Amino acid sequence: SAMGFRTRDAAKAFKNAIELGAEPMYSQAGPMELNIPAIKGIGGMPIFLVDRDIYENDFIFFDDVEKNPRGAGLNEIDHLTHNVYKGRMDYWANFYEKIFNFQEIRYFDIKGEYTGLTSKALTAPDGMIRIPLNEDSDKGNGQIAEFLADFNGEGIQHIAFITDDLVSTWDKLKGLGLKFMTPPPET
């Protein structure tokens, strides 16, 4: 997986991130591909830094195509939840605070009979990017540990979207063939 942040000046943002301690990631661009600066994020995932629409050179709309279609009703990303190993939540919170000037806006300590987790919710300075960081509670055998085992380490657990009409969006996505997870049984 990968993630990208849009910035005014990708080269400058990359240089600043490296100076602040981020680890650079380099890729070999193929013919007709762009070399996009990236730093190493959670689970070794690249965080690309872009300063323009990287697709504007590759795609030109036909005259009769809607340039901003309504789609299924997913308006924007609300948050990207990251699951991390026990004891690594503060490390990654500091990473986002130091490199991108994020701020912690909420802390949760969720305790359950069988599972529990702690979470720090971070937001970008403009409030447009929200990243909750989750780690297992002291029990260490809950949903976070299960995710880390199933997906071979730290990473994005889920992406939440904002919609004006959840039921309509659900119906449209289902009609387009999207498969939904089976909800857990009620207890």
What are these regions (language model features)?
Residues 68-71, 96-97, 143-147:
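Short amphipathic alpha-helical segments, especially helix-boundary/capping motifs
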Residues 95-96, 102, 147, 180, ...:
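Aromatic side chains
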Residues 65-66, 92, 141-142:
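Short hydrophobic/aromatic-rich motifs at helix boundaries and adjacent loops
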Residues 16-20, 89-103:
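Amphipathic alpha-helical segments
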Residues 2-78, 82-84, 106-137, 161, ...:
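Vicinal oxygen chelate
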Residues 86, 93, 150-151, 155:
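Extended non-catalytic domains of envelope/secretory-pathway proteins
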Residues 135-153:
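Flexible internal linker/loop segments at domain or repeat junctions
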